[in-house]
């Protein structure tokens, strides 16, 4: 599972995030999406840790904490929704039987 980290400073690096999160356990991966046009960090990232206990400890400690002059928003990442996905489920082409 991944951790979503929001409201990051635009000057943050993967090493910065790794150092902070490694205080709570082993970090296995850090992603910092960048803007296609400018190449600048978009202000959020994702961190994966070795255990869910480490993730929970990091979320508990860092959500709402001030870091690099900003108040962090840290929680479990939700799966990415596919483009064009509609909420509510169901299908318009459902076959509900015949006569």
Curated annotation (Swiss-Prot):
Gene3D superfamilies: 3.30.70.330. Residues 78-99 are annotated as: Disordered. Pfam families: RRM_1. One of its GO terms (molecular function) is RNA binding. PROSITE patterns: RRM (PS50102). Keywords: RNA-binding. Residues 2-79 form the RRM domain. SUPFAM superfamilies: RNA-binding domain, RBD. Residues 86-99 have a biased composition (Gly residues). Disulfide bonds: none annotated. This is Putative RNA-binding protein RbpE. The gene is rbpE.
